[in-house]
Amino acid sequence: MVKSMRTRFDEQLRQLNVELIRMGSLCEEAISIAAKVLEGEKNISNERVFAIEGEIDQLEHDIESLCMRMLLQQQPVASDLRVISAALKMISDMERIGDQAADIAELCPYVGDTLAQGRLHITNMARAAVSMVTESVEAFVQGDLKMACKVVQDDDKVDELFLKVRAELISCLKEEVGDPEAILDLLMIAKYFERIGDHAVNVAEWVEYSITGIHESNEHHPQNVL
């Protein structure tokens, strides 16, 4: 009986990994499409981002249900509990990534051709964010602590790019260059990409917790949570 329960748990764990990879892939797609809409790429519609957001929301619900079944029907040991609780935290951040990609897509039509250089920095922010999401999910599936730590470090690049964009856009506002409303919308888009990077870091930190039992928020007073 114990063996069959463990076998069933391992099957559910594989399913959890598959669904997390799918959710991460959708987040990556949403970010990439939003960036292409911002760049004005033809044959790309922000409606696709809104559709992906709905798929991400559904996956969050599905993964929550799977995790609850794993907790209620199986007999997870401490390390298993860390994996399940980390997954529940991760999907919350990935759902927010989907929301913010949709927020970006909604603002894109209003920015026009505002500040080409600033848009280049934002495109680079988007690329970095996609990479961070990819690596954070891969780190969870592979149990790769080093990769999770790399994601946390990579957030500095996104933050630096955001500061550059903000400085350039504030300068435009002061010098009255361009449409002020479009500039503010572009600044908000940059802020959403910066927040996406923060959510990817949150995911990576929960990966670290799933492996070590220690969460980054407790770094000054480390303790084994489970």
Q: What is each of the regions a protein language model found here?
A:
Residues M1-L226:
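Cytosolic, long alpha-helical scaffolding segments
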